[in-house]
């Protein structure tokens, strides 16, 4: 009995000490700093295949519209009306979808931390998927001739008809 109490006390002290330690978050190194402000960099980012126009064209051509439900935010009654129009091959109302793609352009020109934020979740998901499939690199931002990480966002709007 005395031995089991001693064992329990030792276990409590051990786990209390092990899990009671404050974990300190390491400060980011200079290479982990992500710049957001174009005023802070000497050379801004650019897409290697045709600049922003080339990037938008590549994004549009790789987007699978079948994976986007433009009407997902509509009330059920409206969805049923639209489905009926589709089944009768009648024109359906067009929908404008918006999202903002955010990502980090790494010093090697690749993208990381890809996120799409907007109201339509299927559109967000497809934009994230599409962006992850793009293997062409960016021309990274530079400060004093050194390539740096740069936070970038691209607003996207698409009309679904």
State where each predicted segment sits.
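Charge-biased low-complexity segments
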Residues: 4-8, 20-161
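Hydrophobic h-region of N-terminal signal peptides that target proteins for export
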Residues: 11-19
């Amino acid at each position: 009995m005395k031995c089991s109490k001693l064992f329990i006390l030792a276990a409590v002290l051990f786990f209390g000490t092990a899990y009671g330690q404050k974990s300190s978050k390491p400060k980011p190194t200079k290479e982990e700093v992500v710049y957001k402000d174009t005023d802070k960099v000497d050379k801004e980012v650019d897409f290697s295949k045709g600049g922003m126009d080339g990037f938008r064209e590549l994004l549009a051509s790789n987007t699978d519209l079948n994976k986007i439900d433009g009407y997902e935010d509509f009330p059920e009654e409206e969805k049923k009306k639209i489905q009926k129009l589709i089944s009768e091959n009648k024109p359906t109302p067009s929908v404008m979808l918006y999202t903002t793609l955010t990502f980090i352009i790494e010093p090697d020109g690749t993208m990381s931390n890809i996120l799409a934020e907007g109201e339509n979740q299927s559109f967000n998901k497809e934009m994230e998927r599409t962006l992850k499939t793009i293997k062409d690199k960016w021309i990274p931002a530079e400060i004093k001739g050194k390539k740096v990480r740069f936070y970038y966002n691209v607003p996207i709007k698409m009309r679904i008809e």
